[in-house]
């Protein structure tokens, strides 16, 4: 591709040769190849402008940077007010194709489930569908583990091109606040957007909850075209402010939930791992058995159904597909059962609202004790630690506080902050031992929640990521229990 083909994206001057061949895009100077455009992005810890000369030395044909941040480095410097936005558009231009119908969902909790459920609804209707998010990429013939909720623009558009080339026509993706704030989705052509809820999260990145909300609202304010559907869960404290944003942006507002008018929850009856749910849509009543536990999963399922319906799937097909949903990996996932029937769930809950939701979800079908094993991540919002401790104290009968990716922090200090709110908890720093202890104490009727990691397969300690899986540790503990 020639540099001139980016002329409507990049402010090219007469001194910059439009015939220059562009082989790729990079924002990390260490990954620059000859012929790449290098985007000097300002990060929280480093400024890409400081690495412009290194990028040029590695073969970059031009540097895109904020005005006045890069001097003479031997190759043309193209100044742009928002290099992140330009990178997203350039990535879309370079890779071109994407699945014809793309939807994105934002919110504090539930994004992974909604993206997965939307894909499953489309699949049930016979469509070639994919989902992209925290747990990775799932598509026909493809199931890859991932670590970023929203990939960087270059990786994202390369992936979208691969999916489109493979025949995928429909794709759902998570839109994290980081991803939205950092313009990673700015080149994606979206047909609809969804919102689940808003709670405390990423306070190490966002200065206030309001800033956090506004970052998420870029999905509705900026990325969706006017008239596009905005499917919003209506029963969250932040639903109304989100609805106002969607309306002000000229979007088609579709609300779901008990207060929802597009898909309305009329009745929910809990039956252990499933829920009989009555839903109203445009005067029609649908009675379905949702094979998932927890009120929050009903809301997630309806956001997914709303996204599928609003992008062209008949309502009866979308709602019928809800009876066949499978939970996303590590989302209230039944991982094991003891010989006397006590159940063990692994869940990704690593923030206050999510922990509260999952503990409330299992209470209706727990005849014995609710036991929870959890910790809080290091180098992340420290304010949530006592909040999560209080939630565990209030909603669980037995609490075991352990480590969960302490990173560069002293693990005992993280646990101490949690224990201030739940002093009666048992403290076991070794996560493997904490899970083993919890499984060993289970009696008939008990439910154990191992919270925090979900699908993750590592434990980050002092700069090293060690292999660790809550699923594997639960299974190992069950074997030891019956040995």
From Swiss-Prot:
Single Gene Ontology BP annotation: cell division
Binding site for meso-2,6-diaminopimelate: 380, 404-407, 452, 456
Protein's organism: Chelativorans sp. (strain BNC1)
Gene name of the encoded protein: murE
Binding site for UDP-N-acetyl-alpha-D-muramoyl-L-alanyl-D-glutamate: 29, 149-150, 176, 182, 184
Domain of life: Bacteria
GO molecular function ontology, one term from the record: UDP-N-acetylmuramoylalanyl-D-glutamate-2,6-diaminopimelate ligase activity
Short sequence motif named Meso-diaminopimelate recognition motif, residue ranges: 404-407
Residue positions where N6-carboxylysine is found in the record: 216
Name this polypeptide is given: UDP-N-acetylmuramoyl-L-alanyl-D-glutamate--2,6-diaminopimelate ligase
This protein's GO CC annotations: cytoplasm
Catalytic activity: UDP-N-acetyl-alpha-D-muramoyl-L-alanyl-D-glutamate + meso-2,6-diaminopimelate + ATP = UDP-N-acetyl-alpha-D-muramoyl-L-alanyl-gamma-D-glutamyl-meso-2,6-diaminopimelate + ADP + phosphate + H(+)
Posttranslational mods: Carboxylation is probably crucial for Mg(2+) binding and, consequently, for the gamma-phosphate positioning of ATP.
Cofactor(s), by name: Mg(2+)
Pathway this chain belongs to: Cell wall biogenesis; peptidoglycan biosynthesis
Positions contributing to ATP binding: 107-113
Family: Belongs to the MurCDEF family. MurE subfamily.
NCBIfam families: murE, PRK00139.1-2, PRK00139.1-4
Keywords: ATP-binding, Cell cycle, Cell division, Cell shape, Cell wall biogenesis/degradation, Cytoplasm, Ligase, Magnesium, Nucleotide-binding, Peptidoglycan synthesis
Protein function: Catalyzes the addition of meso-diaminopimelic acid to the nucleotide precursor UDP-N-acetylmuramoyl-L-alanyl-D-glutamate (UMAG) in the biosynthesis of bacterial cell-wall peptidoglycan.
Subcellular location field: Cytoplasm
Major location category of this protein: cytoplasm
EC nos: 6.3.2.13
């Amino acid at each position: 591709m020639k540099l001139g083909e980016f002329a409507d994206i990049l402010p090219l001057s007469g001194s910059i040769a439009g015939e220059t061949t562009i082989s790729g895009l990079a924002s990390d100077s260490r990954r620059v190849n000859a012929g790449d455009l290098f985007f000097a992005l300002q990060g929280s810890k480093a400024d890409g402008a400081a690495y412009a000369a290194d990028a040029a030395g590695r073969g970059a044909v031009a540097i895109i940077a904020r005005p006045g941040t890069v001097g003479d480095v031997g190759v043309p410097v193209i100044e742009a007010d928002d290099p992140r936005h330009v990178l997203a558009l350039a990535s879309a231009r370079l890779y071109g194709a994407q699945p014809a119908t793309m939807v994105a969902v934002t919110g504090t909790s539930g994004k992974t489930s909604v993206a997965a459920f939307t894909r499953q609804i489309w699949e049930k209707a016979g469509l070639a569908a994919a989902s992209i998010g925290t747990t990775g990429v799932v598509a026909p013939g493809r199931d890859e583990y991932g670590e970023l909720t929203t990939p960087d623009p270059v990786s994202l558009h390369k992936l979208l091109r691969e999916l489109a080339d493979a025949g995928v026509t429909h794709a759902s993706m998570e839109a994290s606040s980081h991803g939205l704030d950092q313009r990673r989705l700015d080149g994606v052509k979206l047909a609809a957007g969804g919102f689940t809820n808003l709670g405390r999260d990423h306070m190490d990145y966002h200065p206030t909850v309001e800033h956090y909300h506004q970052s998420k609202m870029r999905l509705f304010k900026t990325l969706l075209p006017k008239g596009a559907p905005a499917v919003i869960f209506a029963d969250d404290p932040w639903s109304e402010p989100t609805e106002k944003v969607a309306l002000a942006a000229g979007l088609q507002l579709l609300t779901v939930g008990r207060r929802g008018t597009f898909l309305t929850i009329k009745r929910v009856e809990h039956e252990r791992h499933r829920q009989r749910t009555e839903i109203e849509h445009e005067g029609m009543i649908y009675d379905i058995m949702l094979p998932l536990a927890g009120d929050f999963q009903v809301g997630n399922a309806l956001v997914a159904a709303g996204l599928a319906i609003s992008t062209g799937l008949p309502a009866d097909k979308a709602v019928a597909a809800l009876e066949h949903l499978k939970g996303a990996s590590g989302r209230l996932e039944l991982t094991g059962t003891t010989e006397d029937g006590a159940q063990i769930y692994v869940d990704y809950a690593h923030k206050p609202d999510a922990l509260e939701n999952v503990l409330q979800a299992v209470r209706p079908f727990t005849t014995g004790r609710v036991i929870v094993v959890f910790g809080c991540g290091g180098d992340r919002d420290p304010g949530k630690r006592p909040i999560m401790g209080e939630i565990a104290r209030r909603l669980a009968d037995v609490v075991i506080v352990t480590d969960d990716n302490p990173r560069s922090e002293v693990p005992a200090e993280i646990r101490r902050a949690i224990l201030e709110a739940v002093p009666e908890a048992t403290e076991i720093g070794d996560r493997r031992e904490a899970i083993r202890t919890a499984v060993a104490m289970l009696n008939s009727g008990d439910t154990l929640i191992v919270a925090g990691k979900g699908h993750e397969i590592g434990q980050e300690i002092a700069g090293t990521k060690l292999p660790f899986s809550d699923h594997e540790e639960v299974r190992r503990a069950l074997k030891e229990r019956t040995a």
